[in-house]
Swiss-Prot record:
Residues 1-84 are annotated as: Interaction with CAVIN1. There is a cross-link at residue 128 (Glycyl lysine isopeptide (Lys-Gly) (interchain with G-Cter in SUMO2)). Residues 20-78 are annotated as: Leucine-zipper. This is Caveolae-associated protein 3. The keyword Cytoplasm applies. Residues 135-201 are annotated as: Interaction with CAV1. Residues 201-210 have a biased composition (Pro residues). It comes from Bos taurus. GO terms for biological process: circadian regulation of gene expression; cortical actin cytoskeleton organization; negative regulation of fermentation; negative regulation of phosphatidylinositol 3-kinase/protein kinase B signal transduction; positive regulation of ERK1 and ERK2 cascade. The leucine-zipper domain is essential for its localization in the caveolae and for its interaction with CAV1 and EPS15L1. Belongs to the CAVIN family. Regulates the traffic and/or budding of caveolae. Plays a role in caveola formation in a tissue-specific manner. Required for the formation of caveolae in smooth muscle but not in the lung and heart endothelial cells. Regulates the equilibrium between cell surface-associated and cell surface-dissociated caveolae by promoting the rapid release of caveolae from the cell surface. Plays a role in the regulation of the circadian clock. Modulates the period length and phase of circadian gene expression and also regulates expression and interaction of the core clock components PER1/2 and CRY1/2. It is found in: Cytoplasm; Membrane, Caveola; Cytoplasm, Cytosol. Residues 157-168 have a biased composition (Acidic residues).
């Protein structure tokens, strides 16, 4: 059928109505075969290119997935960093407030220090014992004359201690005052004990006057009796309490009577 169709059609270059040669037919078939082969080759190349494009598309898709995952992790890390930055900012604000308060406290302390230095009342005590007492406090104080005269002597002793020591610290002044009061109380107790145990001062007894009818012998007999009465009484210890006003007078009266 093909040959008849080819034969029926006019061949270019051939005379009209003339027979068609087989050589032309073969050449045409060869051309057609070559064209088909080239077409197939091109289709194969296109298929290979399409496969390469599909692989590249798949690679691009995988890369896009990895990029999206990395973007998610980056967003999470950024969120954590922002939270940490907020916490650090809050801590920095709190630290700044504390620094401002400390600066204000330091300024107040500096102002107080300047005032104390200006007044001259700043003294640093490295070590002070609680029971420390000045050396003058251990000196033997004169025995007081009486309970009435203890009052004015106490402020004088405290004034001397304060003037000698010149300690502006209140605690030291309180300790000194307390020790002074304790010493005064102990002295009072000792004096009260001495007065309670000591014998009362004897009242001087004057000998009775002899009348005109008495003889001289009776007078000399009465005087030894008076002396015997006065001898057992011990003399008062004037050395222990020299300031008592009645002791010296009583001793003088006793000496005069014994001499008489």
């Amino acid at each position: 059928m093909g040959e008849s169709a080819l034969e029926s059609g006019p061949v270019p270059g051939a005379p009209a109505g003339g027979p068609v040669h087989a050589v032309t037919v073969v050449t045409l078939l060869e051309k057609l075969a070559t064209m088909l082969e080239t077409l197939r080759e091109r289709q194969g190349g296109l298929a290979q290119r399409q496969g390469g494009l599909a692989g590249s598309v798949r690679r691009i898709q995988s890369n896009l997935g990895a990029l999206s995952r990395s973007h998610d992790t980056t967003s999470n890390t950024l969120a954590q960093l922002l939270a940490k930055a907020e916490r650090v900012g809050s801590h920095a604000d709190a630290a700044q407030e504390r620094a401002v308060r400390r600066a204000a406290q330091v300024q107040r302390l500096e102002a107080n220090h300047g005032l104390l230095v200006a007044r001259g009342k700043l003294h640093v005590l490295l070590f002070k014992e609680e029971a420390e007492i000045p050396a003058k406090a251990f000196q033997k104080a004169p025995e007081p004359l009486g309970p009435v005269e203890l009052g004015p002597q106490l402020p004088e002793a405290e004034a001397e201690e304060s003037s000698d020591e010149e300690e502006p610290v209140e605690s030291r002044a309180r300790r000194l005052r307390r020790t002074g009061l304790e010493k005064v109380q102990s002295l009072r107790r000792a004096l009260s004990g001495r007065k309670g145990h000591a014998a009362p001062t004897p009242t001087p007894v004057k000998p009775p006057r002899l009348g005109p009818g008495r003889s001289a012998e009776g007078q000399w007999e009465a005087q030894p009796a008076l002396e015997s009465k006065l001898e057992p009484e011990p003399p008062q210890d004037t050395e222990e309490d020299p300031g008592r006003p009645g002791a010296a007078e009583a001793a003088a009266v006793l000496q005069v009577e014994s001499a008489a």
